[in-house]
Each structure stands twice: as C-alpha cells, then as structure tokens.
C-alpha cells in the first residue's frame, strides 16, 4: 500500500516545470516598427508607442556598432550596449504625432554600421520584449 501511495504522489508531482511567473504583471507592449534614417550628422530613430499612458514608462535604447570595412563579421551575433535610458517626458525625445516618437543619436561615427533595438519598461522595471532591429550604415 505504501508503494502505491508513493507512486501516486510521485506521478502527480511530475510534470512540466517552469520559472515562476507573476500573472498579474502587465508588461508594456513591444515596439515593432523601429526605423533609422540619417539626419544631418546623426542617426534619427523613429517608432510608434502602443501604450496610451506613458507617464510612468521608461525607454531603453540599445546600440551595436560595427566597422563597415575591416575584419568584423557582419553576420555574427551583435553585442548591444545601453546608450540611453529615458522617460517619455525627456527633452531628448521628440513627439511627431499622437503616438510617434523620434530620438536623435548624435554619438555616431563615419564608416560604421549601426544597429538599434529599444525596450519600454514600466515603473517596476518590467520591460517589453526587444523591438525589431533597425540598421543604418553611416557614411
């Protein structure tokens, strides 16, 4: 009888295990239309914000930099670095429409290929998935 009971308990406790996940956390919507253009001597990023209330949200902008010429592997995985962590009220962001935002990256150099991703985070630090990748070759 003890063997049967142990077997039942063992079988019921088996199953797919996963990391704990709080179902009540509301993650911000990920950006899916990130784009990059050359504007003057800078690269301007643009995207649509899907959240209606941005007062408590923060933005993280990530950038990867590769030399266009040389021995860098363009198809290799990229290393992205945080270049800005901003609130949506920051003067470095420009609203061009009700949900359209732009950011000017002035820290670019000629002869490099730049790749960008962004994430939107709530006040608790819970972030959306990374956006699509926007790339720009800076002359």
Which residues fall in each region the model found?
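Bacterial N-terminal signal peptides that target proteins for export
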Residues: 1-3
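C-terminal motif of bacterial Sec signal peptides marking the signal peptidase cleavage site
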Residues: 10-13
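Acidic surface patches and DE-rich sequence motifs
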Residues: 122
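Recognizes extended acidic, P/S/T-rich segments that occur
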Residues: 58-109, 126-132
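Pro/Thr/Ser/Gly-rich low-complexity, intrinsically disordered linker/stalk tracts
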Residues: 15-57, 110, 125-139
């Amino acid at each position: 009888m003890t063997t049967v009971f142990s077997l039942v308990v063992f079988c019921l406790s088996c199953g797919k295990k996963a990391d704990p996940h709080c179902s009540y956390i509301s993650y911000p919507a990920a950006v899916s239309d990130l784009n990059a253009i050359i504007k003057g001597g800078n690269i301007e990023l643009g995207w649509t914000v899907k959240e209606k209330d941005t007062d408590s949200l923060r933005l993280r902008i990530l950038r990867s930099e590769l030399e266009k010429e040389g021995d860098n592997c363009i198809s290799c995985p990229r290393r992205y670095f945080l270049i800005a962590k901003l609130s949506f009220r920051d003067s470095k962001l420009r609203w061009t429409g009700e949900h359209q935002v732009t950011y000017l990256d002035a820290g670019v150099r000629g002869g490099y290929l730049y790749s960008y991703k962004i994430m939107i985070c709530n006040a608790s630090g819970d972030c959306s998935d990374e956006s699509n990748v926007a790339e720009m070759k800076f002359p």
